[in-house]
């Protein structure tokens, strides 16, 4: 920052200290006689240095902080510091040594000596080189008068570079350090001409020396005055620079504060925006919550109103109940006052309830018996229809047989005999039809009587219920009166008791009459049917035997064709309908009957089904009068075993069969075959009670086991108690149900009348053994010949008979 200038043109002994902010110039005269002036100058110099030291420290502190300077201050400082070159040239041209002080800067300009004393510029550097070489520096010697330039002391540190000064000059921006540019002028001493003179000058006169001394003393005084002025101005300048630095520091601080404030404002703006968004969301949420709260408030208010209304209603009901309770207590007190106890009333009520339960049970039993009677009547009617169809079929068969006979194929005697037999058969058939019609009329009459009796019983029940209600109303009205309370209770009890007794007695008589009438009718009907069909069976048997003995080849071939066709038809139907069972006929009678009617059934039924396509539909009867598995099972078990039970399940029946066979037979090896056979009679896990009786199914299972060869050879009666075992398990019933008073034993095949019947029975025994009892609509199993003999024994609706 500081610069040292030494000019060879100046011959006076000057010491110029160029400092920023002030220029301290010391001028020594040539004569050097005045030591006081020298000491004064040195003291001033030392004091100036002491003053400048703290200023330098402050400048160093300010430069360490790198304070920016405003462009306006720099431009002002440069204007004050720069000195135009024209002044410098004027200084060189001036010949006077009068000191001048410029207003622009604190620079002292001294007037130069005369022009002839001014040395040339070439000699000045030589003299300048000699000056530092002299050890004894004498300010008063005129011969050695010269400028001596000392190194100026810098107030600011040397950290600032020339690049910064050049950049500050060219740019308007603030620089980190304050720089002052001082104008360097050549100070021309008065003794330039003398210093430029040769080494050995001529001695001057004393007047000139005195004049020079006076001039040098005045010059020293001017220099001292200029120094004092410069020091004062420098001190003021230093003080001004410090204030400028402080202002610059304040400016930097204010700028930093402005930046911080701007950043804070931006951050606060962002925060305010986020807070505004949060407030908006909070407002919307609060509005939603407010609406929900209002809706909840309304709902709660409505619910509260509803609860209040319900509470008021309950309070009213409670008040009414309390009033009623008070009245009842008052009545109890009144009754206790009369001397009666509540225990007797409770006992009477209990007895009345028990009696009512008994009457209800009796009524229920009576209704069940009535239903069973009605079902039996329907069964009888269906049996009659069945027998009528059978007689019609027999009539058709006889007509066909009579039409087939030709006079050419037989002898006259045979034809006459056959015609007579046919006529007799026709007559008997006519008689049988008449009897059947008569029995039909009787059954219709009995059914009408039964319906009338049923209507009468229903009317009586309605009347008795009305009487009971009237008695109850009378008892209630009498209970209200305090005096006749117990009398009314007794009267109602007696009325109910008497009415129940009369009702039971009347219905018992009706039931007895109905049972006796049914018994008589069934006996008469069974006797008449048995006699007619037994006689008809014998006659047909003799006719068939005689026909087979005749040597008629055509007739034999026709019968053979009919047999083969019937056999094929039966095999196909048995394969197709293997899970349907045979009719409900006792097994022994069925086997015995098969020996007598096998051939006749084959001949007649095959021809009948050929001529009549609706033959299968004529024999599809629902003999039970029930619908559904549960209803049929209940009806069957109640009628046969007098027990109510659910339908039989396949899993339970299989477990029962396994248990029985493990007890009876060791190592039974036909489990799978037996299960397949049993599963044919079960649908969806239950027995088909609506298609077949369970007792027939048990008999069929028993027959299936008895027909196994390995158990047939050893002992025929291995599975004889199977039915009892099953009935005991399901119904706690030891005896198997009987369908007639006498169940004929199974006749052996050796007891047949002739070997032909034995062969036919053996031939068709296995095929017709497992034909179903009940048939679905639209199905047939090949057995078109119904059982012609009806055996009636125990009535199924009451186990007493």
Swiss-Prot record:
Keywords of this entry: Cell cycle, Coiled coil, Membrane, Signal-anchor, Transmembrane, Transmembrane helix
Parts of the chain on the Lumenal side: 243-801
Composition skew (Basic and acidic residues), residue ranges: 84-95
Keyword Nucleus in record: no
Topological domains, Cytoplasmic: 1-221
A single GO BP: positive regulation of transcription by RNA polymerase II
Biased composition (Acidic residues): 124-133
Subcellular location per the Swiss-Prot or TrEMBL entry: Cytoplasmic granule membrane
Compositional bias annotation for Basic residues: 178-187, 468-481, 762-780
Transmembrane stretches, start-end: 222-242
Location of region: Disordered: 79-214, 397-417, 460-483, 736-780
Biased segments, Low complexity type: 168-177
A cellular-component GO term for this protein: membrane
Membrane topology: Single-pass type II membrane protein
Protein name listed in UniProt: Cell cycle progression protein 1
Lineage: Eukaryota, Metazoa, Chordata, Craniata, Vertebrata
């Amino acid at each position: 920052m500081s610069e040292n200038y030494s000019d060879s043109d100046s011959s006076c002994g000057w010491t110029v200290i160029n400092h920023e902010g002030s220029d301290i110039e010391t001028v020594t005269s040539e004569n050097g006689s005045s030591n006081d002036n020298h000491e004064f100058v040195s003291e001033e110099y030392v004091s100036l240095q002491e003053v400048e030291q703290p200023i330098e420290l402050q400048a160093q502190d300010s430069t360490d902080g790198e304070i920016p300077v405003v462009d306006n201050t720099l431009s002002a400082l440069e204007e004050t510091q720069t000195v135009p070159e024209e002044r410098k040239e004027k200084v060189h041209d001036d010949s006077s040594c009068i000191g001048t002080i410029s207003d622009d800067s604190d620079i002292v300009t001294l007037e130069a000596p005369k022009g002839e004393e001014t040395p040339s510029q070439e000699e000045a550097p030589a003299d300048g080189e000699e000056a530092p070489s002299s050890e004894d520096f004498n300010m008063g010697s005129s011969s050695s008068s010269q400028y001596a330039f000392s190194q100026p002391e810098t107030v600011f540190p040397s950290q600032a570079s020339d690049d910064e000064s050049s950049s500050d000059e060219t740019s308007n921006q603030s620089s980190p350090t304050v720089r002052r540019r001082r104008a360097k002028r050549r100070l021309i001493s008065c003794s330039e001409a003398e210093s430029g003179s040769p080494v050995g000058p001529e001695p001057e006169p004393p007047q000139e020396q005195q004049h020079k001394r006076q001039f040098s003393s005045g010059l020293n005084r001017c220099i001292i005055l200029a120094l004092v002025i410069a020091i004062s101005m420098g001190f003021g300048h230093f003080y001004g620079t410090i204030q400028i630095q402080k202002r610059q520091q304040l400016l930097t601080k204010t700028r930093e504060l402005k930046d911080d404030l701007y950043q804070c404002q931006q951050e606060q703006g962002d925060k305010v925006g986020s807070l505004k968004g949060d407030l908006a969301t909070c407002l919307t949420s609060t509005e939603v919550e407010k609406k929900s709260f209002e809706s909840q408030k309304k709902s709660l208010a409505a619910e509260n109103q509803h609860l209040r209304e319900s509470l008021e209603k309950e309070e009213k009901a409670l008040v009414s109940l309390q009033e009623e309770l008070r009245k009842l207590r008052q009545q109890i007190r009144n009754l206790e006052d009369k001397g009666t106890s509540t225990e007797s009333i409770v006992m009477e009520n209990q007895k009345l309830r028990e009696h009512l339960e008994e009457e209800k049970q009796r009524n229920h039993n009576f209704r069940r018996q009535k239903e069973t009677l009605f079902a039996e009547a329907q069964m009888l009617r269906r049996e009659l229809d069945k027998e009528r169809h059978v007689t019609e079929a027999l009539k058709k068969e006889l007509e066909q047989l009579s039409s087939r006979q030709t006079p050419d194929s037989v002898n006259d005697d045979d034809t006459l005999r056959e015609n007579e037999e046919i006529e007799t058969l026709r007559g008997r058939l006519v008689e049988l039809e008449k009897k059947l019609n008569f029995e039909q009329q009787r059954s219709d009459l009995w059914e009408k009587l039964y319906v009338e009796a049923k209507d009468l019983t229903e009317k009586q029940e309605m009347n008795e219920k009305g009487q009971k209600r009237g008695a109850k109303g009378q008892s209630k009205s009498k209970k209200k009166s305090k005096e006749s309370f117990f009398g009314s209770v007794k009267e109602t009890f007696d009325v109910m008791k008497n009415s129940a007794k009369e009702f039971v007695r009347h219905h018992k008589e009706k039931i007895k009459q109905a049972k006796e009438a049914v018994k008589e009718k069934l006996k008469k009907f069974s006797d008449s049917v048995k006699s007619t069909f037994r006689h008809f069976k014998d006659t047909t048997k003799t006719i068939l035997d005689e026909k087979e003995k005749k040597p008629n080849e055509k007739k034999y071939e026709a019968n053979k064709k009919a047999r083969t066709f019937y056999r094929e038809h039966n095999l196909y139907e048995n394969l197709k309908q293997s899970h349907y069972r045979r009719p409900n006929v006792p097994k022994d009678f069925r086997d015995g009957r098969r020996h007598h009617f096998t051939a006749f059934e084959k001949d007649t039924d095959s021809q009948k089904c050929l001529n009549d396509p609706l033959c299968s539909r004529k024999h599809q009867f629902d003999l039970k009068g029930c619908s559904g598995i549960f209803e049929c099972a209940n009806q069957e078990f109640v009628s046969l075993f007098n027990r109510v039970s659910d339908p039989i399940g396949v899993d339970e029946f299989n477990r029962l069969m396994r248990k029985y066979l493990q007890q009876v037979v060791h190592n039974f090896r036909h489990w799978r075959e037996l299960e397949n056979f049993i599963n044919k009679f079960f649908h969806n896990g239950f027995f088909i009670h609506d298609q077949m009786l369970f007792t027939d199914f048990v008999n069929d299972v028993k027959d299936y086991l008895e027909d196994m060869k390995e158990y047939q050879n050893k002992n025929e009666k291995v599975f004889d108690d199977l039915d009892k075992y099953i009935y005991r398990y399901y119904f706690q019933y030891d005896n198997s149900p009987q369908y007639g008073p006498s169940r004929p034993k199974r006749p052996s095949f050796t007891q047949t009348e002739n070997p032909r019947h034995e062969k036919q029975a053996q031939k068709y025994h296995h095929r017709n053994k497992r034909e179903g009892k009940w048939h679905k609509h639209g199905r047939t199993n090949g057995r078109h010949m119904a059982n012609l003999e009806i055996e009636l024994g125990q009535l199924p609706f009451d186990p007493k008979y």
